[in-house]
């Protein structure tokens, strides 16, 4: 690799703004805000809006919607009844 062209890769603490959940990970992101981690070291703090602690997919609060196909949407739009549904 060429020297001096790659960003500095270091450990960063990410904090979920909605739940306060924190985790440490490697990143090239920089922040002026710092926080002391459980190991006693100080790391840059990056605030994120959503993480695995608050995302509906990971929390089990995911809502599924019925995705209609193109034909179903056409029939609903123009008022055609499904012949098989009447039987």
Curated annotation (Swiss-Prot):
PROSITE patterns: RIBOSOMAL_L31
A Pfam match: Ribosomal_L31
Keywords tagged on the record: Ribonucleoprotein, Ribosomal protein
GO CC terms of this entry: ribonucleoprotein complex; ribosome
Alphabetical list of InterPro entries matching this protein: Ribosomal_bL28/bL31-like_sf, Ribosomal_bL31, Ribosomal_bL31_B, Ribosomal_bL31_sf
GO molecular function: structural constituent of ribosome
GO biological process, one term: translation
PANTHER family in the cross-refs: 50S RIBOSOMAL PROTEIN L31, CHLOROPLASTIC, LARGE RIBOSOMAL SUBUNIT PROTEIN BL31C
Homology family: Belongs to the bacterial ribosomal protein bL31 family. Type B subfamily.
Quaternary structure and partners: Part of the 50S ribosomal subunit.
Name recorded for this polypeptide: Large ribosomal subunit protein bL31B
The organism's taxonomic lineage, starting at the top: Bacteria, Bacillati, Bacillota, Bacilli, Lactobacillales
Name of the gene encoding the protein in the UniProt record: rpmE2
